[in-house]
């Protein structure tokens, strides 16, 4: 088995590449063509996470974002924003049947934000994940969605267009700490799964080549809750655009783009708020960062 190769990204080249995947705004498009995103998550205790993911996908540029949550979380999530479409179905006995018609219309599915760990909910979402892979939907898996994979990594092994977004602890739970264990478990994922490991320097793992691309540090020392949800939501939109632009490595490009955007939003907001910085402050910076670094002057 070949050694893991850690490679610093070429940031100037990436910034040029990012602009090639961003679709130009034109009058001949209809609602939904710039992205329809689904977020599977949201429980009584965790209503902020699915909101952050869903609204971030739209702030980046998706047209529509749906949240599929537990019934007791729905009124709270609805109250956060009228821009989101909220489905209170996750704790229904026929949840998968209710979700399936929507899945067929969505471009990318985010699984995990605010999901919680109730056994019945986790089993339902496991079945939703199986359905997503059957429908060949691009998937981003984060937070408690990754918890499902701890003992069931085969759910994604060999599948196409899947991005996992673990933090350092979630990464160790999934792949272990010993470098040989990491390589062995990574190799089982196949060539259709990319891992975005979140940290001071986000790292994008390409499992089938043993390559690890290291992003610049960026961000700030402020680590408030919700930043990972901003990442998963923005990643979903970038993933759809990257796939639509027929880039040879769409998951890698999307992972780099979302990592860069969130770090820049954190850095920009930190200059204003310092230690008081919250994830909601970062959301308000997405537009300025996007215009500055992701769009050509004529994109509009």
UniProtKB/Swiss-Prot annotation:
<dbReference type="InterPro" id="IPR017953">
    <property type="entry name" value="Carbohydrate_kinase_pred_CS"/>
</dbReference>
<feature type="binding site">
    <location>
        <begin position="219"/>
        <end position="228"/>
    </location>
    <ligand>
        <name>ATP</name>
    </ligand>
</feature>
<feature type="domain" description="YjeF C-terminal">
    <location>
        <begin position="14"/>
        <end position="293"/>
    </location>
</feature>
<keyword id="KW-0521">NADP</keyword>
<keyword id="KW-0547">Nucleotide-binding</keyword>
<keyword id="KW-0456">Lyase</keyword>
<dbReference type="InterPro" id="IPR000631">
    <property type="entry name" value="CARKD"/>
</dbReference>
<feature type="binding site">
    <location>
        <position position="229"/>
    </location>
    <ligand>
        <name>(6S)-NADPHX</name>
    </ligand>
</feature>
<dbReference type="Pfam" id="PF01256">
    <property type="entry name" value="Carb_kinase"/>
</dbReference>
<comment type="similarity">
    <text>Belongs to the NnrD/CARKD family.</text>
</comment>
<protein>
    <recommendedName>
        <fullName>ATP-dependent (S)-NAD(P)H-hydrate dehydratase</fullName>
        <ecNumber>4.2.1.93</ecNumber>
    </recommendedName>
</protein>
<keyword id="KW-0067">ATP-binding</keyword>
<dbReference type="GO" id="GO:0047453">
    <property type="term" value="F:ATP-dependent NAD(P)H-hydrate dehydratase activity"/>
</dbReference>
<dbReference type="GO" id="GO:0110051">
    <property type="term" value="P:metabolite repair"/>
</dbReference>
<dbReference type="GO" id="GO:0046496">
    <property type="term" value="P:nicotinamide nucleotide metabolic process"/>
</dbReference>
<dbReference type="GO" id="GO:0005524">
    <property type="term" value="F:ATP binding"/>
</dbReference>
<feature type="binding site">
    <location>
        <position position="114"/>
    </location>
    <ligand>
        <name>(6S)-NADPHX</name>
    </ligand>
</feature>
<dbReference type="InterPro" id="IPR029056">
    <property type="entry name" value="Ribokinase-like"/>
</dbReference>
<comment type="function">
    <text>Catalyzes the dehydration of the S-form of NAD(P)HX at the expense of ATP, which is converted to ADP. Together with NAD(P)HX epimerase, which catalyzes the epimerization of the S- and R-forms, the enzyme allows the repair of both epimers of NAD(P)HX, a damaged form of NAD(P)H that is a result of enzymatic or heat-dependent hydration.</text>
</comment>
<feature type="binding site">
    <location>
        <begin position="198"/>
        <end position="202"/>
    </location>
    <ligand>
        <name>ATP</name>
    </ligand>
</feature>
<keyword id="KW-0520">NAD</keyword>
<keyword id="KW-0597">Phosphoprotein</keyword>
<feature type="binding site">
    <location>
        <begin position="167"/>
        <end position="173"/>
    </location>
    <ligand>
        <name>(6S)-NADPHX</name>
    </ligand>
</feature>
């Amino acid at each position: 088995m070949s050694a893991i190769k850690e490679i610093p990204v070429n940031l100037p080249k990436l910034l040029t590449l990012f602009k090639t995947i961003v679709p130009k705004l034109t009058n001949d498009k209809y609602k939904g063509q710039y992205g329809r995103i689904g977020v599977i998550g949201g429980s009584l205790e965790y209503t902020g996470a699915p909101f952050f993911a869903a609204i971030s996908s739209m702030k980046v540029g998706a047209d529509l974002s749906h949240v599929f949550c537990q019934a007791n979380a729905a009124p709270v999530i609805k109250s956060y924003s009228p821009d989101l479409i909220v489905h209170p179905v996750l704790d229904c006995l026929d949840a998968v049947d209710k979700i399936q018609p929507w899945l067929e219309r969505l471009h990318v599915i985010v699984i995990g934000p605010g999901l919680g760990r109730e056994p019945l909910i986790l089993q339902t979402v496991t079945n939703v994940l199986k359905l997503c892979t059957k429908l060949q939907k691009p998937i981003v898996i984060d937070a408690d969605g990754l918890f499902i994979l701890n003992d069931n990594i085969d759910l994604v092994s060999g599948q196409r267009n899947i991005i996992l977004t673990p933090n350092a602890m979630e990464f160790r739970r999934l792949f272990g700490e010993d470098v040989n264990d990491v390589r062995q478990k990574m190799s089982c994922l196949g060539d259709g799964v990319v891992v975005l490991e979140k940290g001071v320097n986000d790292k994008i793992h390409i499992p089938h080549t043993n390559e690890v691309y290291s992003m610049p540090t960026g961000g700030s020392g402020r680590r408030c809750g919700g930043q990972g949800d901003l990442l998963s939501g923005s990643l979903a939109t970038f993933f759809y655009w990257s796939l639509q632009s027929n880039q040879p490595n769409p998951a890698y490009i999307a992972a780099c783009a979302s990592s860069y955007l969130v770090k820049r939003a954190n850095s920009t907001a930190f200059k204003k708020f310092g230690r008081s910085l919250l994830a909601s402050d970062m959301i308000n910076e997405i537009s300025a960062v996007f215009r500055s670094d992701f769009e050509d002057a004529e994109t509009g």
